[in-house]
Amino acid sequence: LSNYEIRSRYPNFYMSLYDELLRIPFLITGPGITSKKITRPIRTIDIFPTLFDILKLSFPSKIQGKSFFNLFTQDDKNPDPCFIHTIPYEKPSKYDRVGIRTPNFKYFRNAKNKNEDVHLYDLINDPLENKNIANYENTKVMQMEDILSSITSFTTNIEKENIDEEEEQKIRDELKKLGYL
């Protein structure tokens, strides 16, 4: 088996940030929408503004994200990096990872410790993400960490509300029904 095939057999693989787990198909069709395959990653934060753009509605400025509707007619030479994060855990986990993906590189690391489990992949020369070059490309790792830090600086730490056990169980049951737990 190749490295690519071997890692898919790891017990915690579903908690990774490799492209085979991140890439999902997304289809938009309708009047005035040109048929085109967009191969670069699209940020989920940009879907809502794109739908507003397609419907010719004004987009509230306080909401983050940018329309990618123009990608149907032209190429984006400078796309924003995509923030990537493993599935959030109910309790802190050593497997939690955060990172960013650009057209040329992917960088991710432990969510709590920026020096732990650091990965950097050159997606042009290694599209299957087999060779982690983080130990050889310190400057690039620092650049990617700076980008990641600027993205995560906008997030806030939300304190868990104090809810009783009965309410917490109801929430758990609903999440189970929806397939999240």
Regions found by a protein language model. Name each.
Residues L1-L181:
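Catalytic domains that recognize anionic headgroups
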